[in-house]
């Protein structure tokens, strides 16, 4: 702070938060990025060690724990290890971290990864049920559409904006997306976006009003506990995605068993599933992925069709 740094994130007691993510964004102090790299290099071996600690010595595999209803939104949570915290391939040393998650039968099997396409925005489209917006998701460029509706000039900013908005970001956070510290700028962006999507404005108001009771209703009728009204929309959208993905998984497993395929589920992370698949069954599994998610759309009576993509490879680094 003596070098001119002003903290943006504080603890509940008012102390500045100084971690890897904060340090990596400080451009005017050369030492900051070096410290951030040091913290990263210290963290990665610790993560890898935690994976090795839970390897089953009999099977040679990691049998992680999945708690299917632990999260408020209905998402699955993970431990021993936390598979949701394995670094992504685009992260520093992320590719190397994901390459260690592989099949032990590379001559006959592959890792088959599939994930739901644009899940959050499709769930948003389901709830606001605006044909033009749904059409843009399915056939156009929804991020350019959002960019224009919010009055932004950069498509990448629009992507950051919409997901921040759905996660309950306020005017201050929204303003920071376009490099402003003025809350009024963020409020103007939000107001313009909502004025372009009146059904979203109405949906948001209804959800936040319902959240005053501490509960909101999910896609399948279940009740979600919410701590604050501004997080309620995120809980509804994320919860809908979690419900849909579980139905999708159930459908996939049903078809795998019916066809008698050599397929094993090896990881489930939010809207993504990783399987170990016999090379002879890759085409059939690809067809199942598409069929199962189409069935999910119909079973849940969704206003916006779901879709999925898949990749195959010898490691997780190649499939997601």
Where is each model-derived feature located?
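Conserved "right-hand" nucleotidyltransferase catalytic core of DNA-directed polymerases
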Residues: 1-93, 105-110, 117-120, 180, ...
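Feature marking long nucleic-acid-engaging regions of large polymerase/nuclease enzymes
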Residues: 97, 107-114, 123, 133
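Hydrophobic (often cysteine-bearing) scaffold residues that line and stabilize catalytic clefts
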Residues: 120, 139, 143, 241, ...
């Amino acid at each position: 702070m003596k070098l001119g740094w002003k903290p943006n994130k504080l603890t509940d007691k008012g102390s500045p938060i100084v971690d890897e993510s904060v340090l990596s964004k400080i451009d005017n102090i050369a030492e900051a990025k070096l410290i951030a790299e040091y913290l990263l290099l210290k963290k990665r071996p610790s993560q890898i060690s935690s994976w090795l600690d839970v390897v089953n010595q009999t099977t040679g595999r990691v049998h992680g724990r999945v708690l299917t209803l632990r999260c408020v939104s209905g998402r699955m949570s993970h431990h021993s290890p936390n598979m949701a915290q394995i670094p992504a391939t685009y992260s520093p040393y992320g590719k190397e971290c994901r390459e260690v998650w592989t099949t032990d039968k590379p001559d006959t099997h592959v890792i088959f990864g599939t994930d739901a396409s644009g899940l959050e925005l499709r769930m948003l489209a389901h709830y606001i049920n605006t044909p033009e917006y749904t059409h843009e998701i399915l056939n156009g460029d929804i991020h350019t559409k959002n960019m224009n509706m919010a009055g932004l000039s950069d498509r990448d900013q629009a992507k950051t904006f919409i997901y921040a908005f759905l996660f309950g970001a306020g005017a201050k956070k929204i303003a920071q997306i376009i490099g402003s510290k003025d809350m009024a700028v963020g409020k103007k962006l939000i107001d313009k976006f909502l004025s372009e999507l009146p059904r979203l404005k109405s949906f948001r108001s209804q959800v936040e009003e319902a959240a005053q009771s501490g509960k909101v209703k999910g896609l399948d009728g279940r009740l979600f506990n919410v701590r604050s009204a501004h997080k309620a929309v995120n809980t509804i959208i994320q919860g809908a995605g979690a419900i849909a993905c579980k139905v999708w998984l159930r459908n996939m497993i049903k078809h795998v068993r019916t066809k008698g395929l050599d397929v094993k589920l090896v990881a489930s992370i939010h809207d993504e599933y990783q399987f170990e698949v016999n090379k002879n069954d890759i085409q059939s599994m690809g067809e199942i992925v598409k069929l199962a998610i189409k069935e999910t759309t119909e079973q849940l009576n969704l206003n916006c069709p779901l879709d999925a993509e898949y990749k195959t490879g010898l490691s997780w680094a190649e499939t997601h």
